[in-house]
Amino acid sequence: MAKKKATFICQECGYQSPKYLGRCPNCSAWSSFVEEVEVKEVKNARVSLAGEKSRPVKLKDVDNISYHRTQTDMSEFNRVLGGGVVPGSLILIGGDPGIGKSTLLLQVSTQLANKGTVLYVSGEESAEQIKLRSERLGDIDNEFYLYAETNMQAIRTEIENIKPDFLIIDSIQTIMSPDITGVQGSVSQVREVTAELMQLAKTNNIATFIVGHVTKEGTLAGPRMLEHMVDTVLYFEGERHHTFRILRAVKNRFGSTNEIGIFEMQSGGLVEVLNPSQVFLEERLDGATGSAVVVTMEGSRPILAEVQSLVTPTVFGNARRTTTGLDFNRVSLIMAVLEKRCGLLLQNQDAYLKSAGGVKLDEPAIDLAVAVAIASSYKEKPTSPQEAFLGEIGLTGEIRRVTRIEQRINEAAKLGFTKVYAPKNALQGIDIPQGIEVVGVTTVGQVLNAVFS
């Protein structure tokens, strides 16, 4: 007879305790513990839908044909996955409510239906509701199946009947296994349902997409084990009041985690943005103070983005600092360098900084653009609309080299920029395209003197 053991599990982080706790000692969440009964039982060996048991094989004998990636019609989506969908992969997609996760997967699944059988399982919407949303996306292939169900046993039965090539679960928090105690979305339910989906995906080469809810802190809800079990973790980011969405990989066993895909939400669904640099800069005002352009790298893709700054005298006892899309600590460091090394009196100035377009900038190469934007607003002097800035700022005010400098300069030249300020030590041996001047600089003070003299 199976032994039953009661444990209390934190719904936020998955921490387990033998007794109820008002506050989680791991994540400090209040009233997050729920009681769950753990049933220990011996399960049979895992088999595929064809009834074949898995057995050890030599690495050199593994068939590489099964690794063939399936391309979707969205090049941005393929880029983030590393070149396409790998058979048997388990892909988790998280994002804020209403950001467009279901819309993205519905578009992707309709495209995959042209290359295989798709089973779309929804625990949040009825089949009629999904059909209503899908009508704006265009024609749907006959190999696209909808299934509104939350019972894992029933879902497994239909998987065995249909034998899909692609499976979409929307969402994992709504699916429950009747063999496991706990409500839908509980730690034990999410863990066991994900384990069963992983077994189905790996033994039958079913590419599986899972939608995951996020907490108010922006992390994926449920046990941390969920992210360890899957092959790929994607975050769909963006502000609900902006039309742009960014798909970012934070874990990918079949590709790079540095790639991003950029989409725009329109009435007909998500449309990929193939030239994000032009989109992010098209509304920039000529002659405005507090603005500077940087060429940032998102994976292997260079993107031109605008850094905006507003520096005003404070009316409070302490100066206020606010950032959106930029790292607060990095901005504070740059302001300290400007005050110490360049003589800008910023201790009594409020500073508000943001990256235009909602894109997040977090690499060291943006330092020089941030410094120039702050100085431009402080001095009330605009920068030239044809100038871009590259470089990391050290604590002594020096400009340090950044990666892929040649690729960044080429992107700036392609969009019509005529001058780029870049670290002098990084310019040796690179080919500079015609029509653009690259100014090698060594200190941030040298840049400010050249730009605002």
Swiss-Prot record:
NCBIfam families (UniProt xref): sms
EC identifiers of the protein: 3.6.4.-
Organism of provenance: Streptococcus pyogenes serotype M1
SUPFAM superfamilies associated with the record: P-loop containing nucleoside triphosphate hydrolases, Ribosomal protein S5 domain 2-like
Protein name, UniProt field: DNA repair protein RadA
CDD domains xrefs: RadA_SMS_N
Residue ranges of the motif RadA KNRFG motif: 251-255
Top-level taxonomy: Bacteria, Bacillati, Bacillota, Bacilli, Lactobacillales
KW Membrane (keyword) present: no
Enzyme class of the recorded protein, top EC level: hydrolase
Zinc finger (C4-type): 10-27
One Gene Ontology term, aspect cellular component: cytosol
Molecular-function GO terms, alphabetical: ATP binding; ATP hydrolysis activity; ATP-dependent DNA damage sensor activity; damaged DNA binding; zinc ion binding
Keyword vocabulary terms for this entry: ATP-binding, DNA damage, DNA repair, DNA-binding, Hydrolase, Metal-binding, Nucleotide-binding, Stress response, Zinc, Zinc-finger
Family: Belongs to the RecA family. RadA subfamily.
Classification via SMART domains: AAA
GO process terms (BP): recombinational repair
Residue numbers binding ATP: 95-102
Domain characteristics, as noted in the entry: Has a putative N-terminal zinc-finger, a middle region with homology to RecA with ATPase motifs including the RadA KNRFG motif, while the C-terminus is homologous to Lon protease.
Its biological purpose: DNA-dependent ATPase involved in processing of recombination intermediates, plays a role in repairing DNA breaks. Stimulates the branch migration of RecA-mediated strand transfer reactions, allowing the 3' invading strand to extend heteroduplex DNA faster. Binds ssDNA in the presence of ADP but not other nucleotides, has ATPase activity that is stimulated by ssDNA and various branched DNA structures, but inhibited by SSB. Does not have RecA's homology-searching function.
